[in-house]
Amino acid sequence: MKKLLLIMGLLSLFGCGKKAPAYPQDKVVAKDGSEIVFTFFAHASFAIEHNGKHIYIDPVGEFAWEKMPKADAILITHSHYDHFEMATVEKLADENCAIICDKTSAEAFEHNCTTMWPGGIAKPFEGLTVKAVPAYNISEGHTDFHPQTREDCGYVLTLGGTTIYVAGDTEDNDDVLSQKDIDIAFLPVNQPYTMTVEQAVRVIKAIKPTLFYPYHYGQVEEKTDIEALVKALEGVCEVRVFPME
């Protein structure tokens, strides 16, 4: 069995001149030749840097946010505490920051934000397009965690001609399985709240990204078997694993 490679490389400072702590990073080349940099914090919180713009996804937790570059956009998938934390948003956002969030989270901003529903599209700044994708559970006994009626969001970001699917908290429902033209996928892999390893494999085989980053994976009730996930996708998709428990 091929040993699991836990990528810890590319530890570098996120941003220049900010004296920010080092967090794991990874870099990819977009279709237009530009560079996309991912910075991984933990669980569902990560950042994307592209052409000098900084995008934060579900930023929460005890990190040195005040030392990070200010956000050009913050995307919030839903209102659960491990995805949305107003104190963190306030540390990252200034008056020029675009807040893009689901309708439940929007209530905390008194709707002074871009409220997204599944199917909605936002263009917070030149060079970034965000499409909202439904995120919900379908397994018996698990639907209350992320009900379809709440209209939580995943997002498909387009940067430099490259599509990045951030699924949010969801299982392998038909809306997820029907995503097309995805280059890079972030899927949650922890039960009982999101996908099992088998569900994540099914989604990757259906949407066929070039690169898959498992995130939001389990240390809760069931520890995610990341090694089994990587093995199941050998020859199907490149999988890069970062510490995103």
Where are these regions (language model features)?
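C-terminal motif of bacterial Sec signal peptides marking the signal peptidase cleavage site
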Residues: L13-G15
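A short acidic, amphipathic alpha-helical/loop segment
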Residues: A87-L92, A108, D175-S178, Q199-V203, ...
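Active-site environment of divalent metal-dependent phosphoester hydrolases
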Residues: F63-W65, H80-F84, A106-F109, G120-K123, ...
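Metallo-beta-lactamase
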Residues: V156-I207, Y215-E221
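Core dinuclear metal-dependent hydrolase active-site scaffold
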Residues: K19-P69, T115-K180, P243-E245
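Positively charged n-region of N-terminal signal peptides that target proteins for export
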Residues: M1-L4
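Active-site metal-binding motif and surrounding structural segment of the metallo-beta-lactamase
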Residues: G61-S105, K180-F186, K208
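Binuclear metal-ion centers of metallo-dependent hydrolases, dominated by the metallo-beta-lactamase
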Residues: H111-E126, V201, K205-E245
